[in-house]
């Protein structure tokens, strides 16, 4: 199941500012480099803003920033304080220990955050000047997330519980065994062997540090929050502190692996009883939030079981009558991070429309939706206190910074400029929005990035970027792996088509791809390549094609169908054999929905059409150099897919290399591995595309 926006950004955040005291590792390729072209080292040591919190009076912001050391191959994190007008920036922690997930507590008198104590993640609090640290939790095994009740009397936290271990439970005398006895599905998920489940706990704050809380799912093996990417944003405490709502898919094994049907549950703290608030709603229900007066609850809801990319709708529950209202009916865009206004009359949220993510306001009285912000950018998170809203913003040209938003005018004022000096060293990269006609008579938005000092009288090598997901928009994102800017910085024109099958262009466009993997979306890629080759500045013999995940599948497929359009390929974590992927991947609901069914369902026309488009069936047509990258801890698309593709290319006589990581998952997270990724990526492109 995909998780979006700031929770994921924080999960993989690795960097803090180079001007933070004591964090230079002496590497001359860090941000202090005077290079006029972005290097992998510059990209990977840029400051990365993680979680942030606006004070109750709206005047101050606390936020976390991290910076990896390439030499040490690990990251340090630090908390900073800044006024909401951008003044008074100062460090609150010294970076010697992890400091993440900051929140203002006690009406702004203190700041809570997570840090590592004796090898375990625990909650601490400090004064706003960074002094008087107090340990709030001392939970055995540590915690993973937290929320304070509005009255400050209760703490809700998340922590992992151990699941039964068949091998160890049956053989208690064998204390050094490593084998696993597996009896059902979901034994692996994302990048881990499933040995624990996240649970939600509640405890009184009267006695600190807290050493034990009440498990809301005591005796159950279910997840709350749900793996692999959900967090405490799927939990809400009522304003009166009498109950807790949480999202959970109360299934295990095979049943879990084929269903996306989660629900919102309400735990009554007085009676200890649990009620399903979304009984009969069959899709993915998440992100509960109570109105300021506690009379209503909103949540995000998908309609259909098994469809992880269904439209994310906003619903309202009247807690007195039980009536449910579909607030965003007719709005064909995903609702992210819905947040109540202080007066309870409006709900603010983020939505991606035509490949730009912006802030919106929904007025409850008439259900009218107003777009607040404008521009070629993505807003990826926000915090609201009263009428003050602070948001995290990024684009293909600049990483995340914090901005104060005027809710009436929609204007943005920068609060942070974490990478200002680095960006000032770089050339002027231009990002252009184009609309192209597709072969089925529709319009497709394509982003095009041009190198610095672009001269239309010259010829440039180019890269066609294939998106993953598959139902994931190429918006104005900033990435530390697939970064369009660094590609343009290295002299390439970068072509990024929002082909059929991505959200942000209406429901029909998004859903078209399911059961049509080798169809219209592939024709869209060829359209983008052909249209760009009409430009005189595109080198017709210097176009590469790259992509990860479903984008990697696209690369493998195009390698057998491109008819000499491309001069090299790069596939990261791609699907090579669809039949093998159906059985290897862990989230079977995705395979069932997108592929149409199982390969043994011979009378299932959709499934059989899908499997007939598997890239491994077209290796006989491969004739173009291909680089293959994969992580062996990738349990979404197993490394065997990359190994098969490499072996096939080598045996077929196609120039090929494989970059294989034994300790990376679907992403590449370790600093030195990330540098190796970028260096290998550009070495391959330069070898085949630059004359």
Curated annotation (Swiss-Prot):
Q: Enumerate the UniProt keywords alphabetically.
A: Aminopeptidase, Hydrolase, Periplasm, Protease, Serine protease, Signal
| Pfam families, A to Z | DPPIV_N, Peptidase_S9
Signal peptide position in this chain? Answer: 1-20
Claim: Hydrolase is one of the keywords in the record = yes
Q: How does activity depend on pH?
A: Optimum pH is 6.7, using Lys-Ala-MCA as substrate.
Query: Which EC number(s) does UniProt give?
Result: 3.4.14.-
Q: Name one GO biological process term.
A: peptide catabolic process
Compartments where located? Periplasm
Major site of localization recorded for this protein = periplasm
Against Gene3D superfamilies, the record matches this protein to: alpha/beta hydrolase, TolB, C-terminal domain
The keyword Protease belongs to this UniProt entry's keyword annotation: yes
**Could you name the domain of life of the organism this protein comes from?**
Bacteria
Active-site residues are 549 (charge relay system), 634 (charge relay system), 666 (charge relay system)
Q: Name one GO molecular function term.
A: serine-type endopeptidase activity
A GO CC annotation recorded here is:
periplasmic space
Indicate the enzyme's highest-level EC class: hydrolase
Q: Which PANTHER family match?
A: DIPEPTIDYL-PEPTIDASE 5 (PTHR42776:SF13), SERINE PEPTIDASE S9 FAMILY MEMBER (PTHR42776)
Q: Spell out the family assignment given in the record's similarity comment.
A: Belongs to the peptidase S9C family.
> What role does it play?
Catalyzes the removal of dipeptides from the N-terminus of oligopeptides. Prefers Ala and hydrophobic residues at the P1 position, and has no preference for P2 residues. Shows the highest dipeptidyl peptidase activity toward the synthetic substrate Lys-Ala-methylcoumaryl-7-amide (Lys-Ala-MCA). Is likely involved in amino acid metabolism and bacterial growth/survival of asaccharolytic P.endodontalis, that utilizes amino acids from extracellular proteinaceous nutrients as energy and carbon sources.
Q: How does it assemble?
A: Homodimer.
Q: What is this protein called?
A: Dipeptidyl-peptidase 5
Q: What is the lineage of its organism?
A: Bacteria, Pseudomonadati, Bacteroidota, Bacteroidia, Bacteroidales
Which gene does this sequence derive from?
A: dpp5
């Amino acid at each position: 199941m995909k998780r979006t926006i700031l929770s994921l950004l924080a999960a993989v955040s690795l960097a803090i500012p180079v001007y933070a005291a004591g964090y230079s590792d002496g590497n001359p390729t860090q941000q202090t480099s005077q290079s006029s072209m972005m290097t992998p080292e510059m990209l990977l040591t840029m400051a990365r803003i993680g979680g942030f919190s606006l004070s109750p009076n709206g005047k101050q912001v606390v936020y976390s920033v991290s910076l990896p050391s390439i030499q040490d191959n690990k990251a340090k994190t630090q908390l900073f304080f800044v006024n909401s007008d951008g003044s008074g920036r100062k460090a609150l922690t010294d970076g010697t220990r992890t400091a993440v997930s900051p929140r203002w507590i006690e009406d702004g008198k203190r700041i809570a955050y997570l840090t590592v104590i004796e090898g375990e993640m625990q909650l601490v609090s400090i004064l706003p000047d960074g002094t008087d640290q107090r340990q709030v939790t001392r939970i055995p095994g540590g915690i993973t997330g937290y929320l304070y009740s509005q009255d400050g009397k209760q703490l809700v936290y998340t922590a992992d519980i151990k699941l039964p271990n068949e091998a160890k439970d049956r053989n208690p005398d064998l204390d050094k065994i490593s084998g696993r006895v597996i009896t059902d599905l979901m034994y692996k998920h994302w990048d881990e062997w499933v040995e624990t489940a996240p649970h939600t706990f509640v405890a009184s704050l009267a006695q600190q540090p807290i050493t034990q809380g009440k498990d809301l799912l005591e005796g159950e093996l279910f997840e709350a929050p749900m793996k692999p990417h959900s967090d405490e944003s799927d939990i809400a405490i009522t304003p009166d502190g009498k109950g807790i709502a949480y999202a959970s898919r109360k299934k295990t094994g095979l049943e879990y692996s084929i269903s996306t049907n989660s629900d919102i549950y309400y735990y009554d703290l007085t009676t200890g009883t649990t009620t399903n608030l979304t009984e009969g709603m069959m899709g993915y229900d998440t992100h509960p939030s109570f109105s300021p007066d506690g009379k209503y609850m909103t949540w995000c809801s998908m309609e259909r079981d098994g469809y992880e990319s269904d439209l994310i709708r906003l619903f309202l529950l009247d807690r007195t009558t039980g009536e449910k209202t579909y607030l965003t009916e007719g709005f064909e865009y995903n609702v992210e991070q819905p947040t109540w206004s202080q007066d309870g009359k409006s709900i603010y949220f983020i939505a991606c429309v035509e490949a730009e993510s912006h802030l919106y306001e929904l007025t409850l009285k008439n259900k009218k939706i107003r777009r607040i912000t404008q521009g070629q950018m993505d807003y990826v998170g926000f915090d609201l206190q009263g009428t003050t809203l602070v948001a995290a913003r990024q684009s293909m040209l600049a990483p995340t910074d914090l901005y104060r938003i005027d809710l009436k005018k929609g204007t943005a004022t920068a609060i942070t400029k974490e990478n200002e000096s680095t960006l000032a060293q770089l050339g002027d990269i231009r990002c252009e929005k184009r609309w192209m006609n597709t072969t089925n008579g529709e319009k497709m938005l394509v982003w095009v990035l041009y190198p610095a000092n672009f001269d239309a009288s010259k010829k440039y090598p180019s890269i066609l970027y294939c998106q993953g997901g598959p139902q994931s928009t190429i918006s104005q994102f900033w990435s530390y792996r697939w970064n369009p800017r660094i590609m343009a910085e290295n002299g390439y024109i970068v072509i990024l088509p929002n082909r059929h099958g991505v959200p942000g262009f209406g429901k029909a466009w998004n859903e078209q791809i399911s059961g049509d993997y080798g169809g219209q979306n592939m024709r869209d890629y060829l359209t983008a390549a052909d249209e760009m080759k009409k430009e005189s500045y595109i080198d017709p013999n210097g176009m590469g094609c790259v992509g990860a995940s479903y984008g990697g599948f696209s690369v493998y497929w195009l390698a057998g169908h491109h008819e000499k359009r491309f001069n090299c390929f790069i596939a990261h974590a791609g699907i090579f054999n669809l039949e093998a992927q159906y059985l290897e991947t862990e989230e079977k609901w995705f395979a069932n929905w997108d592929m149409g069914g199982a390969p043994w369902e011979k009378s299932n026309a959709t499934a059989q059409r899908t499997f007939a488009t598997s890239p491994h069936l077209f290796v006989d047509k491969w004739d173009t150099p291909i680089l293959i990258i994969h992580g062996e801890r990738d349990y979404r698309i197993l490394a065997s897919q990359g190994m098969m593709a490499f072996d096939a290319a080598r045996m077929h006589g196609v120039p090929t290399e494989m970059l294989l990581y034994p300790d990376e998952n679907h992403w590449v997270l370790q600093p030195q591995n990330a540098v190796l990724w970028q260096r290998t990526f550009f070495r391959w492109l330069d070898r085949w595309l630059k004359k």
